[in-house]
């Protein structure tokens, strides 16, 4: 299999030399980190032009990650979407269970090139942490993962996985005790230990070069999916759909389709209990431009410019910022961003589980809910591509509590009977 990683960007889509996508991006960091961030940028530029780097990354993607990931049509699920055809890009089938391994392997190789011996990372749902711990075990690197205390509780399985892989997991007890605060602590660690440490940033946010670099490592998703759907459906999709927190899985899918003007790029943000309640993390829906974690982008903030606390049932989407390229795509009208509530996402999770035998991550379920609505808009001639960014093993405790699956057997069976009747009725 040839490399899908360093294909030249379509003209005009790379950031400026200063890392800007239009008005968004840049590098807003303390002086103590300037040299380290500049080193990452220089080494990444060298790696992009080094065939040996691309070959090593490609070998890992194929023989370790298991790429290319499958493209799966889900006709029974699609019956609930107005009959539009729906295909899932199965990033959930990657080693470690999500898209996160794509970026992690690339940055782990870069860490080796820089001669660093220690890696730190933030994680929300735990998938980036698990992928980072996996790569560190593979390459013999010391690993510390920062995770909000609330997220360590709702993602206890992934905490155990990280520790099994040899990582130190630090529960962050400051602020909202979620992803934003984990990133803050990771930056503090990097300042204190910059000589031997690389911060393996997990999304397309942060200071330049991280938004472009993380995107580049994930763009294989869209490159593969574009080729696969042309082979399977004979044409490009009407829409490419992905969940959006920081935005890495979404930009990985979208990027290959940006030049295809007939393909709508639809990002599904977490509306939580409803955007109108204030309890959400729908940054592009309700945010304003500001500075967060080293770059300028849309952020959730109050009238005084202070970052507000986000909320989502999904730990991986519970973030008050967004990658700067998404902000640019929103402003120029190339990207569409919709807000999906907790309830809509959870119903989509259960529907996919019971119609197709695939249990998605709660993050991915936001995209599935968006696809259901989009399918009803497009009708039976519609063709939708959804990035299934991760599997739902990590979310089973949350799902079980949400749906009452820990209740008595009789209650569970009654719930299942009700669902089957609803599904059969909708399909008629």
From Swiss-Prot:
N6-(pyridoxal phosphate)lysine carried by residues: 100
Keywords noted in UniProt: Amino-acid biosynthesis, Aromatic amino acid biosynthesis, Lyase, Pyridoxal phosphate, Tryptophan biosynthesis
Pfam families attached to this UniProt entry: PALP
EC numbers on record: 4.2.1.20
Keyword Amino-acid biosynthesis belongs to the record: yes
Cofactor: pyridoxal 5'-phosphate
Keyword match Amino-acid biosynthesis: yes
Record's subunit section: Tetramer of two alpha and two beta chains.
Top EC category: lyase
A molecular function GO annotation: tryptophan synthase activity
NCBIfam families noted in UniProt: trpB (TIGR00263)
Gene: trpB
The protein's name: Tryptophan synthase beta chain
Xref: PROSITE patterns: TRP_SYNTHASE_BETA
SUPFAM superfamilies referenced in this protein's UniProt entry, alphabetically: Tryptophan synthase beta subunit-like PLP-dependent enzymes
Function recorded in the entry: The beta subunit is responsible for the synthesis of L-tryptophan from indole and L-serine.
Domain of life, source organism: Bacteria
Pathway given in the UniProt record: Amino-acid biosynthesis; L-tryptophan biosynthesis; L-tryptophan from chorismate: step 5/5
Catalyzed chemical reaction(s): (1S,2R)-1-C-(indol-3-yl)glycerol 3-phosphate + L-serine = D-glyceraldehyde 3-phosphate + L-tryptophan + H2O
Organism classification: Bacteria, Bacillati, Actinomycetota, Actinomycetes, Kitasatosporales
């Amino acid at each position: 299999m040839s490399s899908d990683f360093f294909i030249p960007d379509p003209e005009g889509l790379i950031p400026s030399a200063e890392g800007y996508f239009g008005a968004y991006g840049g590098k807003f960091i303390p002086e103590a980190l300037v040299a380290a961030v500049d080193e990452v940028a220089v080494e990444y530029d060298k790696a992009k032009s080094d065939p040996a780097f691309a070959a090593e990354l490609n070998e890992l993607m194929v023989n370790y990650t298991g790429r290319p990931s499958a493209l799966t049509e889900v006709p029974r699920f699609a019956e609930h979407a107005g009959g539009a055809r729906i295909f899932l890009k199965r990033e959930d089938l990657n080693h470690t269970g999500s898209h996160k391994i794509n970026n992690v392997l690339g940055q782990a190789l870069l860490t080796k090139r820089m001669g660093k011996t220690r890696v730190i990372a933030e994680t929300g749902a735990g998938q980036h942490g698990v992928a980072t711990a996996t790569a560190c075990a593979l390459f013999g690197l010391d690993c510390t993962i920062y995770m909000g205390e609330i997220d360590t509780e709702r993602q206890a399985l992934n905490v155990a996985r990280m520790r099994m892989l040899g990582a130190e997991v630090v529960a962050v007890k400051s602020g909202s005790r979620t992803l934003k605060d984990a990133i803050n602590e990771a930056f503090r660690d990097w300042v204190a230990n910059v000589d031997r440490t690389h911060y393996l940033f997990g999304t397309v946010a942060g200071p330049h070069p991280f938004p472009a670099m993380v995107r580049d490592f994930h763009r294989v998703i869209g490159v593969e999916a574009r080729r696969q759907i042309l082979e399977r459906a004979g044409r490009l999709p009407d829409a490419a759909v992905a969940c959006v927190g920081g935005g890495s899985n979404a930009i990985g899918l979208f990027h290959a389709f940006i030049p295809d003007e007939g393909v709508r790029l639809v990002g599904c943000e977490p509306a939580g209990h409803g955007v109108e309640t204030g309890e959400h993390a729908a940054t592009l829906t309700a945010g304003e431009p500001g500075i967060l974690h080293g770059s300028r982008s849309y952020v959730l903030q109050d009238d005084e410019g202070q970052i507000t606390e986000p909320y989502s049932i999904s730990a991986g989407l519970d973030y008050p910022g967004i990658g700067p390229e998404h902000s640019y795509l929103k402003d120029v009208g190339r990207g569409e961003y919709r807000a999906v509530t907790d309830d809509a996402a959870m119903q989509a999770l259960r529907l996919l589980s019971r119609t197709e035998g695939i249990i998605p991550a709660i993050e991915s379920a936001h995209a599935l809910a968006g696809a259901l609505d989009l399918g009803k808009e497009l009708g039976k001639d519609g063709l939708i591509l959804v990035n299934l960014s991760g599997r739902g093993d990590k979310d089973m405790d949350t799902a079980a509590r949400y749906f009452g699956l820990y209740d008595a057997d009789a209650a569970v069976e009654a719930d299942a009977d009700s669902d089957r009747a609803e599904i059969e009725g909708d399909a008629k």
